[in-house]
Curated annotation (Swiss-Prot):
One of the primary rRNA binding proteins, it binds specifically to the 5'-end of 16S ribosomal RNA. The gene is rpsQ. GO terms for cellular component: cytosolic small ribosomal subunit. One of its GO terms (molecular function) is structural constituent of ribosome. This is Small ribosomal subunit protein uS17.
Length: 77
């Protein structure tokens, strides 16, 4: 099974080797036909502390690195 890749924005880089990435997705409501924006936060591994708040990044699914980290930052958009 291929690993998922998501695009998002770094909203926090305060912790060592970890960034928090906010990923927004849009979908159409099945009944009301209105487009809705939903966001979710992911803790992603950043081994070199390279990314700062506001950076647009891609994250990929990986093996569990810690209790909350199962994503790794692969590159900047």
């Amino acid at each position: 099974m291929p690993k998922r890749v998501l695009q998002g924005v770094v909203i926090s880089s305060k912790t060592d080797k970890t960034v928090t990435v906010k990923v927004e997705r849009r979908f159409k409501h099945p009944i009301y036909k209105k487009f809705i924006k939903v966001s979710k936060k992911y803790a992603a591994h950043d081994p070199n502390n390279k990314f700062q708040e506001g950076d647009k990044v891609n994250i990929i699914e990986s093996r569990p690195i810690s209790k909350t980290k199962t994503w790794v930052v692969i590159n900047e958009e």
